[in-house]
Amino acid sequence: MVDVNRFKSMQITLASPTKVRSWSYGEVKKPETINYRTLKPEREGLFDEVIFGPTKDWECACGKYKRIRYKGIVCDRCGVEVTRAKVRRERMGHIELKAPVSHIWYFKGIPSRMGLTLDMSPRALEEVIYFAAYVVIDPKETPLERKSLLTEREYREKLQEYGQGSFVAKMGAEAIQDLLKQVDLEAEIAELKEELKTATGQKRFKAVRRLDVLDAFYKSGNKPEWMVLNILPVLPPDLRPMVQLDGGRFAASDLNDLYRRVINRNNRLARLLELGAPGIIVQNEKRMLQEAVDALIDNGRRGRPITGPGSRPLKSLSHMLKGKQGRFRQNLLGKRVDFSGRSVIAVGPTLKMYQCGVPRLMAIELFKPFVMREIVAREYAGNVKAAKRMVERGDERIWDILEDVIKEHPVLLNRAPTLHRLGIQAFEPVLIDGKALRLHPLVCEAYNADFDGDQMAIHVPLSEEAQAEARLLLLAAEHILNPKDGKPVVTPSQDMVLGNYYLTMEDEGREGEGMIFKDIDEAVMAYHNGYVHLHSRVGIAVDSMPDKPWKENQLHKILVTTVGKILFNSIIPSEIPYLQETTNENLTDSTPDKYFLEPGQDIQTVIDSLEINAPFKKKHLGNIIAEIFKRLRTTETSAFLDRLKDLGYYYSTLAGLTVGIADIPVIDNKQEIIDAAHHRVEEINKAFRRGLMTEDDRYVAVTTTWREAKDALEKRLIETQDPKNPIVMMMDSGARGNISNFSQLAGMRGLMAAPNGRIMELPILSNFREGLSVLEMFFSTHGARKGMTDTALKTADSGYLTRRLVDVAQDVIIREDDCGTDRGLVIRAITDGKEVTETLEERLFGRYTKKSVKHPETGEVIVGPDTLITEDMAAAIVNAGVEEVTIRSVFTCKTRHGVCRHCYGINLATGDAVEVGEAVGTIAAQSIGEPGTQLTMRTFHTGGVASNTDITQGLPRIQEIFEARNPKGEAVITEVKGTVIEIEEDAATRTKKVFVQGKTGMGEYVVPFTARMKVEVGDEVHRGEALTEGSIQPKRLLEVRDTLSVETYLLAEVQKVYRSQGVEIGDKHVEVMVRQMLRKVRVMDPGDTDLLPGTLMDISDFTDANKDIVISGGVPATSRPVLLGITKASLETNSFLSAASFQETTRVLTDAAIRGKKDHLIGLKENVIIGKIIPAGTGMARYRNIEPLAVNEVEVIENIAVDEAIVESSED
């Protein structure tokens, strides 16, 4: 068996007849499977033990040789080799076909490879192969043309006319095989290359396609005649099994039926040929054999599929590979694993960040081998069998052992759907009673889990290395930041937020106000004894908190704060200032001076002069977490998060917030606002009836009126709300609900959308507290139903988008430290009209500069070249008034099959520079795909208002961008740089004409009459700039501008969609995906290279092909860049394994086999498929080739290091 981790590449070619014979262990001559009485395989049948190996380990068929000691002996009675039964999964047989048969993939695929090789139409091929016509193979002296078709009648007439044997014409695959043998590849290729020099149009296109196929055969060493089969391989029997069901019936794989048909027809054909049957009968039998082999290889590709019982089409070999249930996606890319379990999850509020609760019953089953080993080691049992019995009986002693075994042994928890890498994290197991897994509440957000019946899977990493990786790389406490935007993903929610909000509230005149305490303990004791309220403002000696970073002038003073804030600050690391207010200055700099008593000042006077501070809300807690992470990194942050969680839960319980109907306020002037709106609507309708406005204008005015009425109610609600109202507290703290929910409870529900997406003019005037009328209830159900269907459709769409994104970028890995590129990317803030979509500061953070950044006024260098920009540097650059910066970018990186560290920058998930080996392509795909479900589905229906086209937004727009489709509502772009000199309206054709005067000439552009113009007369325009509103077609932009312009445009467009929905994604993720779409070029003129015109190839391969030619002084090839959609780009990848496992499996494999393609196993998927360790992370060659040192070597090195240090210090 080949060691899978040793081989470098994998090649696929056409199998020659000799190759098939060399695979085979014997010919299958009979269609029988197994004997119905003995249930033993029949001799020379499809399950024969002589050919395929024994059905039982180390046992021949007749039972003469049993046991392993006869290994390798071939039984003299039954002829079966004594070996392992699993050889029945790898040993193949063969069938000697009595007539050649064409392979349907090469004849029926698009384009037909046989047709292109022979320069015959697929229709003509079909007629010949299925015995409807003769083809002339050798016209000899006759005027017939080679490869011309003759019907039965014409054939007889020509024979009479020219005499027997005067020419050769045949039918069936045999004829095609003869023609294929006659093809002289070298001569044909030379002829086609000549033809290409002059050919144009359709003729050129056809010649390029033919040349491509012939060249593939020539270079790969495959012979064209191998597309016709003379010998058919038979799949090993355990890959097409027959299993006995209860009740004595058998379930067999469909392949057995398909093979049986082939064998039956082949045997019948042999008999007919022996008997010398009439030609027409033999022909019919050959045709049936051809159809049987077609069905076996790809049932249903031609004609009606062969069906089994209940008219179900049989699954052929091709179907075994295709689709989600096929071999690639079902068994090779992901497998079911042992040492795993799944259960319902419940909340574990007492757990630490790195722990999870595992039920005892699950743990004993999952860790069974470890427990058994320990039982034997402790000599509770003599052998493994006895130990197993102990575990299964549930002996008391096993629980102590289990406790010891799971110590320090992390487990992985996974929740489906795993949308991003935080969907699998490692935890240390804690044994619990019950049957549900316990999950830490803070990791719920990363998993998108809740406790309404969600289930999770648990996996045990077995090897030492796997455990080490789980502990160091996957531990939940390490995953504080989200890889998509570098923001904390473990922010407290709901009860935790509410508890901390309640704790940090301030109130006037509560008991104990103005008391002064000497230290924290005294303050807390006073609170517990009821002398002071949690929200009362009191004083505390600054000196009692010596660890905090006080300013010089604040020492030895009294700080005015509340008991709640004292408790809140007691859990915050001492490096962070004392948090007295929610401002950024307090968090990053120091506690403001106004909260400190000057000597001799009265505390009550100071308290009265201070405003009431807002409590800490969800977003403030998020800022605190981010700041702590920035300063103290992972370990301290996760410890703090646990303290925050415990505090939040405790005070949430103490606060005891409840909600009743009385807590929903009543707005005093609601009726007035609604009456005023009714009056306004009546006026609008009157104006419309008088003909003063159009229907569209009236509709807009009415809906706007109702929107304004709803907003007025909302505003009134906010003005009159009581900050201690439980609903207000929940909403304000960010624990649950938002202003829109609140206004539907207490204000009015407002306008609803009709089923067609158009907003209905009749609003719902009631709110939920008053209750809805029947009609209002009916109106509001449209939206609810549409919401449900949208969500369901969106989930599937978003999942498929993620899959395509992963596929196109899975081989993008950080390959080297620095690619040494001399290009950079100039970036500025991304704007949409006047609005800023993404600020320059956000775009700069975590990138390397290309050139140094200078102050625009003073000229001093703010950041040097090739420096990693930190948050502070980014802020300094923007504050200096710099508007554009040249940075290192993925777009300009020269690394092959990946990116270098400097062009990528920071790893957003860790906050440090990215490591070599990071699989940034997969991370990028997940970061873009995971928020896909949050995007809207809708194309906006404005009811024919405002714009001439519906604007595509949300998920459909993202798909449009990544698939490089022509956008809806396309903008007209200019091809010349110059000035707009005239915009002419033509009422007759309902168009406008825009004239742009450039240096080289005049550009004239026809624009639809209804399109909204972006330019006016006198405006300066650049090539590729949009003249009208709408989306630019990227392929068109590529023709007018360069690759970088297209890349920058696509990046900005993706960001616009996500940011408009409030989703933040790092630029670099989009850059990785967009770069993959522009990796290919199309060869225009091959020059002196041996490239073929019209070929799609990787930029790096193209450059390599040109390099040698340029050095030797030849004419280099020319090419033009091509923008491919992600699906197309995935299928065009150099790895055929990756492409075949993605989509269009048969087409990819057909093409790869003809070309004799080699897969160099560069990406992740191809390595997973063959079971090799993936070349990313710790699987990279540079990390795998490290030799561990022996202990004594380590000591030697340490001693040397110590000696060197001593020498250095003495030199100092």
Curated annotation (Swiss-Prot):
Protein's job: DNA-dependent RNA polymerase catalyzes the transcription of DNA into RNA using the four ribonucleoside triphosphates as substrates.
Catalytic activity entry: RNA(n) + a ribonucleoside 5'-triphosphate = RNA(n+1) + diphosphate
Ligand binding (Zn(2+) 2): C819, C893, C900, C903
NCBIfam families: rpoC_TIGR
MF terms (GO), sorted A to Z: DNA binding; DNA-directed RNA polymerase activity; magnesium ion binding; zinc ion binding
SUPFAM superfamilies: beta and beta-prime subunits of DNA dependent RNA-polymerase
Family the entry assigns: Belongs to the RNA polymerase beta' chain family.
Enzyme's top EC category: transferase
Keyword vocabulary terms for this entry: DNA-directed RNA polymerase, Magnesium, Metal-binding, Nucleotidyltransferase, Transcription, Transferase, Zinc
GO biological process, any: DNA-templated transcription
Lineage, highest ranks first: Bacteria, Bacillati, Bacillota, Bacilli, Lactobacillales
UniProt EC number: 2.7.7.6
Protein name: DNA-directed RNA polymerase subunit beta'
Alphabetical list of HAMAP family matching this protein: RNApol_bact_RpoC (MF_01322)
Annotated Gene Ontology cellular component terms: DNA-directed RNA polymerase complex
Membrane spanning residue stretches: none
S-S pairs: none
Keyword Protein biosynthesis: no
Organism: Streptococcus thermophilus (strain ATCC BAA-250 / LMG 18311)
Subunit structure: The RNAP catalytic core consists of 2 alpha, 1 beta, 1 beta' and 1 omega subunit. When a sigma factor is associated with the core the holoenzyme is formed, which can initiate transcription.
